[in-house]
């Protein structure tokens, strides 16, 4: 059985945000506005998404 996944899309620019949040975006694999990645739905990924929730949109919850 495949594990659950979520789609995360970057909706805002990373210019002018905290360096920690930029690192989190890189950790999620997001590079530019409109970029979408499919990630496993784990507590670690959810924590990263919650940290930068003002920059991303999540689908498949």
From Swiss-Prot:
Pfam family, one: Ribosomal_L30
Gene Ontology CC terms: cytosolic large ribosomal subunit
Origin superkingdom: Bacteria
Record's signal peptide: none
Molecular function per GO: structural constituent of ribosome
Alphabetized UniProt keyword annotations: Ribonucleoprotein, Ribosomal protein
Gene3D superfamilies membership: Ribosomal protein L30, ferredoxin-like fold domain
InterPro entries hit by this protein: Ribo_uL30_ferredoxin-like_sf, Ribosomal_uL30_bac-type, Ribosomal_uL30_CS, Ribosomal_uL30_ferredoxin-like
GO BP, sorted A to Z: translation
Family membership: Belongs to the universal ribosomal protein uL30 family.
Subunit structure: Part of the 50S ribosomal subunit.
PANTHER family listed in its UniProt record: LARGE RIBOSOMAL SUBUNIT PROTEIN UL30M, MITOCHONDRIAL RIBOSOMAL PROTEIN L30
Protein name in the entry: Large ribosomal subunit protein uL30
Origin species: Chromohalobacter salexigens (strain ATCC BAA-138 / DSM 3043 / CIP 106854 / NCIMB 13768 / 1H11)
Upper taxonomic lineage: Bacteria, Pseudomonadati, Pseudomonadota, Gammaproteobacteria, Oceanospirillales
